[in-house]
Swiss-Prot record:
Keyword field contains NAD: no
GO MF: ABC-type transporter activity; ATP binding; ATP hydrolysis activity
UniProt keyword list: ATP-binding, Membrane, Nucleotide-binding, Repeat, Transmembrane, Transmembrane helix, Transport
This protein's GO CC annotations: plasma membrane
Organism, as annotated: Oryza sativa subsp. japonica (Rice)
Transmembrane segments: 563-583, 598-618, 651-671, 682-702, 707-727, 733-753, 791-811, 1252-1272, 1284-1304, 1336-1356, 1367-1387, 1397-1417, 1425-1445, 1478-1498
Binding site for ATP 1: G229, P230, P231, S232, S233, G234, K235, T236
Domain ABC transmembrane type-2: 545-758, 1233-1447
Binding site for ATP 2: G953, V954, S955, G956, A957, G958, K959, T960
Location in or out of the cell: Membrane
Protein name from the UniProt record: ABC transporter G family member 38
Length: 1509
């Protein structure tokens, strides 16, 4: 019987709990729980639940169970709100935590302690994940079964979604053939056709591209569905259509429903998630930060409602849940907890890189495979249960892919999710994880249904999958015209090609097709679905929380980009110091109007400097847009919650910069000394910076591409600059432009600065001869309103512009989409035309052979370049043959053996290779004390001619690192060890000539075609002895080998934006190296991102290359059986860069299998299992732990290691009579030929860059017309010195802003090409000087055209004197000014690590160019200690040349305030310090600046390397 005192205390405890029901503070809850536990007796039935009903004597474990029962009972008494946020966490027996443990009969007993799930500490979360999901794939399944059992026990129905689609058609209208190339001519035609289209005239010749044709099907919940199909079959389009994310410009028809609801009846972006094949992330954030942000934006969805319902049912049924399941469900159901992130990190294998930044092109971060997993994880951390996953395994090894797909399968089966996954090369064991298969080909569904029936269907059609052939690989090849015949099994019938429409018709008659049609004909029963299955609200997280989350992210990104802001601040300080010493107080006076104009000039300079300081926001904002668009499309947040933090977070840095600037310049320059005016001046500087940042942000948001944004930014500054009232006073502005004066923010900044200064007592207490106050007179001369109230009006206007620009920025983010979509280039010829052309090509090759050789050529034989060149050169090689099943896998005859072009077979040996990098700061901050991190450890091996070597290992094992080290591509780190080429120490300069490297990232010049890319590589890298005709034949044959012939005229494009698809780019990367005819080829994941058929094509090419006697090494991630067994030898690495196997594969991989099966504890390989996948599985880190063995140590003690070391020793000595590699020159081609070829490529690049060249020509045209109308006939109005200053201002603005624009817009073009340059230079194609010279020369014709357009408009409209000499000089000065500004922009990029730094650096020098141009402060007024810089300022020489060439000989008289009338010629000499007879020197100096900037660009591109490898 219970003790009465206990009963009273229990009642008191319960009363206390209810009294605090409204309080949600975790500490209060814990305090109440503690009191309840101290006073509560054990409940017999509850205790029995935990300890198990038994008559045995109570033990320590029973006491612990009683304690847990008491805690559950106490939890049940909490208010619902607190109860759903409090869980029980296990505490180890030896921990110092609250829990108490005991050990008995060999078992460890655990107690639990209560925790607030919202405030779980990092250590608690990590301990929970480590304990519950120790071996991710096994423990995840066990845990999810327990979670599902809890839900089923309570009788809760899980919300599910069934996706149906009926008769979906998608098509696009596009140009075909060369008309699709983005040349200047084609784009001009497009613009003309669009304008004519507006008036109903349609001359555009477009072709309909059918992407999806009448597809229907069902994606069911609780079933894993695999989407397969060859490239360009429409897989991505189907996934986008089902997710409701299709481009609105596409023509679509048909119906897509979720549980019977159309896409317009709910919010598909919140219900379903499309996981893209493109990895778009903020490179500055760590993996965990990226996922935390995603989780906070997506919220918890219906998880909290499900938990409430579950807790209610369990309370009614008297069920107590498993503490770990309960804690997990509670922690993942409340906002603010990050346990969901920790869980996803663990099951996707990202926990080991959780604190590593993602990285980008110039910032080292996680690997490509890890980025791919991060893209998947970003959506898995959310509550979405409908997932459309597009090629999520690219770049992952098969073992990792298997683990991820298995974890997703567990989530699907246990959580009743709806998932459709497209994979490129699923291994057989991965294929087995799927329940259903959907096969897409040519935009039509060939099969959809259970995996078990797919082979039955194709056998009925007459095709069978061979043994040791993956079913997925078979499915992707069986519909292909080139691959189908090998699978034909109806020997009694002659084979004929079965087309895709025939397969579709046969499927409709197949029993699965009939079943599918029947199910689609029955409407979905909406009454049976769970109410929360679909999401009907666009907002799942409160606006305030989203705002806080976005602010935190912006602040984090700002800290990670601190270099940019520090650089900007330091630059501002330097410019402020320079400006202070130019406008030095001791040199300035306040005596008359001339002195006032100097102060006005100083204020204008302050204004322009702070205006230009916002220019960096252009590139910073543009860099953020791709990630924003992705988040916006997922409805992570509203656009304004991205824009507002962007503004708010930058306010402190802007305020700091403003204070620093004003503190340095204000009193040093000698502005009005009153404190109030100091702070008013500071306010205007700050508001001006905010306005400028807002202006450049909205420019980036509206334009969205780098070149157009930079051009628009320059245009905006030009309009504000010219119409701001300080170059051309308001009264002198033509009436048709006065509106722009009032719309220019610089107008108000100019008024505010001038009014604040000139209304100070030191100006207002003095008078000019006509009786006006000096301050008023200066303001009138400057065209500024004299009423002092204008200061506040102008400051308010700046605030208004700031708000307006930021609102417009938000609207642009809300309504505009990113520019550029993936495009398809259709060949213009029909099939028959293609066949005719193909016949001509073959006839041409036959003709060559017939001329050179007496042997007849069979009309049915396969003509390969191997044979052609053998016959042409009489050169052949006899090497041992080897047959491989995959070579004929596509029904082709293997090419004849032989050397395509003469070359020397070479082998490579390496001994004890170690590679270290400096310890990352993230690891040092976690307590790691070592200074270096070892990535490769004691690797030895050899690569030999005619032997194809696979370099394998799990993600992060160091495969790419080893290849970079051996090929000499590493730019940092510390390398130890010996590398030999045919027995001689490796010399990188000669090695680059005989080697090729296919990088994992497909980096190519975006604006040239496929064939042009190959011609460029071949003509630069093949020896001079090979004539041009042979090179072209060779290129065409390589294109045919890698099946790029149909795409030879397709533009390469930028990844994910336009041009080639991922797999097409991969094949191009390989072809670019193959046309160089190298002796040793490194290939970094050549089949990554390819489907099985494309991978087979690539591997056929690789095998053919090896068979010619070359040495080829490939890293490979997910090889099918066919591909894996095409290799001869294997070098297998484990994490940490250690070798665990180095030797031959053997027939059917038997040697590898035998080696690992001989290790104690390793399970035997299953029948038909892929040896590559099995090998990675049995040698994984988890296997090492389970078997208690170190595979690296086992290998080092094996006879295989001894044989490898012996081979390395043998091959490290040169053969007798051999010579080391020698080339008379470093490069294959002469410097002049390199220049010609680089110029050829640059010419096509520029011709096909309308966003650069058309835009800048348009800018020049617009600027010319605008300035011509603003300064209309200004050359005729020359009565006073004020008129002359306006004329000079017009010329200054006219030339300067086109120059600035050229400098800004060339930078992104050069930056993109610089990335390609790094790859091509590393490949030994050319030296830096010819490349740079070609880039310099190709600009000249475009700048010339720009200058012609500009001067022919500006010169007559401004009414300058029409004499040949004066026009020539105006043209000459303009041309060289535009040219040196262009080269200055190129130089800026060459000395900067990225575009952001280049833009900040550029803005600083634009400011200094302005300051010392001689316009704002004439040379005679510049302090003598700064005159030297005046002579070094290129813009000063431009202004000098413009003024002297136009007015150096004018003898007319003009009025000068306060002085007698003067002639123009002596006035120019006295006021500006210009000598009219100095024009020849000016011309030479302008040409000299052009050469200097071009040379500096070339020198910098040669010596500086910002690539990190």
């Amino acid at each position: 019987m219970a003790d009465p005192q206990h009963v009273q205390e229990e009642a008191a405890g319960a009363e206390a709990v209810h009294a605090h029901a409204a309080r949600h503070d975790g500490a209060v809850v814990m305090e109440i729980l503690s009191r309840s536990l101290q006073s509560m007796p054990a409940s017999p039935d509850v205790s029995a639940y935990f300890s198990g009903a038994s008559s045995r004597r109570p033990s320590a474990a029973d006491e612990v169970d009683d304690e847990e029962a008491l805690r559950w009972a106490a939890l049940e008494r909490l208010p619902s709100f607190d109860r759903l946020r409090t869980g029980l966490m296990r505490a180890d027996a030896d921990s110092s935590g609250v829990g108490v443990g005991a050990v008995g009969r060999g078992r460890r007993w655990y107690a639990h302690r209560e925790v607030d799930v919202r405030t779980l500490e990092l250590a608690q979360r990590q301990a929970f994940v480590e304990r519950v999901f120790h071996v991710a794939e096994e423990d995840n399944e066990r845990f999810l079964k327990k979670l599902r059992a809890r839900i089923d026990r309570a009788g809760i129905q899980m919300p599910t979604v069934e996706v149906r689609f009926r008769n979906v058609n998608v098509q696009a209208e596009c140009h075909v053939g060369t008309r699709a190339l983005p040349t200047l001519a084609n784009v001009s035609r497009d613009v003309g056709e669009s304008l004519l289209g507006l008036v109903g005239l349609n001359f555009a010749k477009r072709k309909a591209l059918h992407i999806l044709k009448d597809v229907s099907g069902i994606v069911r919940p609780s079933r894993m569905t695999l989407l397969l199909g060859p490239p360009s079959s429409g897989k991505t389009t189907l996934l986008l259509a089902l997710a409701g994310k299709l481009d609105p410009t596409l023509e679509t028809s048909g119906e897509v429903t979720y549980n019977g609801y159309g896409l317009d009846e709910f919010v598909p972006q919140k219900t379903a998630a499309y996981i893209s094949q493109h990895d778009v992330h903020a490179g500055e954030m760590t993996v965990k930060e990226t996922l935390d942000f995603s989780a906070k934006c997506q919220g918890v969805g219906q998880r909290y409602e499900l938990l409430k319902e579950l807790a209610k049912k369990e309370r009614q049924l008297g069920i107590y849940p498993d503490p770990e399941v309960d804690l997990f469900m509670k922690a993942t159901s409340v906002e603010g907890s990050t346990l969901q992130t920790d869980y996803i990190l663990r099951i996707l294998g990202l926990d080991m890189c959780a604190d590593v930044i993602v990285g980008d092109e110039l910032r080292r971060g996680i690997s490509g495979g890890q980025k791919k997993r991060l893209t998947t994880a970003e959506m898995l951390v959310g509550p979405t249960k409908v997932l459309f996953m597009d090629e999520i395994s690219t770049g992952l090894d098969s073992s990792t892919t298997f683990q991820i797909i298995r974890c997703i399968q567990q989530i699907v089966h246990m959580g009743e999710a709806t998932v459709l996954v497209s994979l490129l090369q699923p291994a057989p064991e991965i294929f087995e994880l799927f329940d259903d298969v959907m096969l897409l080909s040519e935009g039509q569904i060939v099969y959809q249904g259970p995996r078990e029936h797919v082979l039955e269907f194709f056998e009925r059609c007459g095709f069978r999958c061979p043994e040791r052939k993956g079913v997925a690989d078979f499915l992707q090849e069986v519909t292909s015209k080139k691959d189908q015949e090998q699978y034909w099994i109806q020997s009694e019938k002659p084979y004929r090609y079965v087309s895709v429409p025939e397969f579709v018709a046969k499927f409709k008659k197949f029993h699965m097709g009939k079943s599918l049609k029947k199910q689609l004909s029955v409407p979905f029963n909406k009454g049976k679905i769970h109410k929360s299955a679909l999401v009907f609200s666009k907002q799942s997280v409160s606006t305030l929380e989203l705002l806080k989350t976005s602010c935190s992210k912006e602040w984090l990104l700002m800290k990670r980009n601190s270099f940019v802001y520090i650089f900007k601040t330091v630059q501002g300080i330097l410019v402020a110091l320079i400006a202070s010493t130019v406008f030095l107080r001791t040199q300035l006076n306040t005596r008359d109007e001339d002195d006032g104009q100097i102060y006005i000039g100083a204020l204008i300079f302050v204004m322009i400097t702070n205006m230009f300081s916002g220019f960096a926001d252009l590139s910073l904002t543009l860099a953020r847009l791709p990630v924003f668009y992705k988040h916006r499309d997922f409805l992570f947040y509203r656009p304004w919650t991205f824009a507002l933090p962007n503004v708010l977070v930058r306010i402190p840095s802007s305020l700091f910069e403003s204070i620093i600037w004003v503190a340095i310049t204000y009193y040093t320059m000698g502005f009005a000394p009153e404190a109030s005016r100091f702070f008013k001046h500071l306010l205007v500087v700050f508001m001006l910076q905010q306005m400028a940042a807002g202006l450049f942000r909205v420019t980036a948001g509206l334009c969205r591409t780098v070149v157009v944004t930079n051009t628009a930014g320059s245009l905006a500054v030009l309009i504000m600059f010219v119409l701001g009232g300080f170059i051309l006073p308001k009264d002198a502005i033509p009436k048709w432009w006065v509106w722009a004066y009032w719309c220019s923010p610089l107008t108000y900044a100019y008024i505010a600065f001038s009014s604040n200064e000139m209304h100070s007592p030191r100006w207002m207490d003095k008078f000019v001869p006509d009786g006006k106050r000096l301050g008023v007179a200066v303001l009138e001369n400057s065209g500024v309103f004299t009423n002092k109230e204008w200061y506040w009006i102008a400051t308010g206007a700046l605030l208004g512009f700031t708000i307006l620009f930021n609102v417009l920025f938000s609207l642009s983010l809300m309504y505009l989409n990113p520019v550029g979509k993936p495009q398809s280039i259709l060949p213009e010829e029909t099939d028959s035309q293609e066949n005719i052309q193909e016949g001509k090509n073959k006839a041409h090759i036959k003709q060559i052979i017939t001329v050179e050789t007496p042997e007849p050529v069979s009309p049915n034989s396969i003509i390969t370049l191997d044979k052609v060149i053998q016959q042409l050169r009489g050169y052949s090689a006899n090497t041992s043959d080897r047959s491989h099943s995959y070579i004929n896998a596509a029904g082709r005859t293997a090419p004849g053996r032989g050397m395509v072009l003469p070359f020397e077979p070479l082998y490579m040996s390496f001994n004890e290779i170690n590679y270290y990098v400096d310890m990352p700061l993230e690891m040092k901050s976690q307590g790691v004390t070592a200074d270096k991190l070892q990535l490769l450890s004691g690797i030895s091996g050899a690569f030999r001619p005619g032997v194809l070597t696979a370099l394998m290992g799990v993600s992060g094992a160091g495969k790419t690192t080893l290849m970079d080290v051996l090929s000499g591509r590493k730019t940092g780190g510390y390398i130890e060890g010996e590398i030999y080429i045919s027995g001689y120490p490796k010399n990188q300069a000669t090695f680059a000539r005989i080697s090729g490297y296919c990088e994992q990232n497909d980096i190519h010049s975006p604006q040239i075609t496929v064939r042009e890319s190959l011609l460029f590589s071949a003509f630069l890298r093949l020896p001079k002895e090979v004539n041009d005709q042979e090179k072209k034949i060779f290129v065409d044959e390589v294109m045919e080998l890698v099946e790029l012939t149909g795409l030879k005229d397709a533009i390469v494009g930028l990844p994910g934006v336009n041009g080639l698809s991922t797999e097409q780019r991969k094949r191009l990367t390989i072809a670019v190296e193959l046309v160089a005819n190298p002796s040793i080829i490194f290939m970094d994941e050549p089949t990554s991102g390819l489907d099985a058929r494309a991978a087979a094509i690539v591997m056929r090419t690789v095998r053919n290359t090896v068979n010619t006697g070359r040495t080829v090494v490939c890293t490979i991630h997910q090889p099918s059986i066919d591909i894996f067994e095409a290799f001869d030898e294997l070098l297998l690495l484990k994490r940490g860069g250690q070798v665990i196997y180095s030797g031959p594969l053997g027939t059917n991989s038997h040697k590898v299998v035998e080696y690992f099966e001989a290790i104690p504890g390793v399970p035997k390989i299953e029948e038909n299992r892929n040896p590559a996948t099995w090998m990675l599985d049995v040698s994984s880190a988890a296997s090492e732990v389970r078997l208690e063995i170190d595979f690296a140590e086992y290998y080092r003690s094996s006879t295989m290691h001894q044989r490898t070391k012996a081979l390395v020793k043998e091959l490290s000595n040169p053969p007798p009579g051999s010579d080391d590699l020698y080339f008379p020159s470093q490069y294959s081609q002469s410097t002049f030929n390199q220049f010609k070829l680089c110029l050829w490529k640059q010419w096509w690049t520029y011709w096909r860059s309308p966003d650069y060249n058309l835009v800048r020509i348009f800018f020049a045209l617009f600027t010319a017309l605008m300035l011509g109308t603003i300064f209309w006939r200004v050359g005729h109005k020359m009565e006073s010195s004020k008129d002359l200053l306006v004329i000079i201002g017009s010329m200054y603005a006219a030339v300067l802003f086109v120059g600035f624009e050229n400098s800004v817009t060339v930078q992104p073009v050069v930056a993109v090409e610089r990335t390609v340059f790094y790859r091509e230079r590393a490949a030994g194609m050319y030296s830096a000087i010819p490349y740079a010279l070609a880039q310099v020369v190709v600009e000249i014709p475009y700048v010339f055209v720009e200058t012609v357009i500009y001067t022919l408009i500006v010169y007559p409209m401004m009414s300058f004197q029409w004499t040949p000499a004066k026009f020539f000089w105006f043209f000459y000065v303009s041309f060289f000014t535009f040219l040196y500004f262009t080269y200055y922009g190129m130089m800026n990029v060459s000395v900067s690590p990225n575009l952001q730094v280049a833009s900040i650096l550029g803005a600083a020098f634009y400011t200094l160019f302005n300051l010392f141009s001689g316009f704002f402060i004439p040379r005679p007024k510049i302090p003598k200690w700064w005159v030297w810089y005046y002579w070094l300022c290129p813009v000063a020489w431009t202004v000098y040349g413009l003024i002297v060439s136009q007015y150096g000989d004018v003898e007319d008289f003009i009025t000068v305030p306060g002085q007698s009338d003067q002639q123009v010629r002596p006035f120019i000499k006295d006021y500006f310090g210009y000598d009219p007879d100095f024009m020849g020197v000016v011309a030479a100096v302008l040409a000299g600046f052009t050469v200097f900037f071009a040379f500096t660009y070339a020198y910098s591109i040669r010596t500086l390397n910002f690539q990190q490898r």
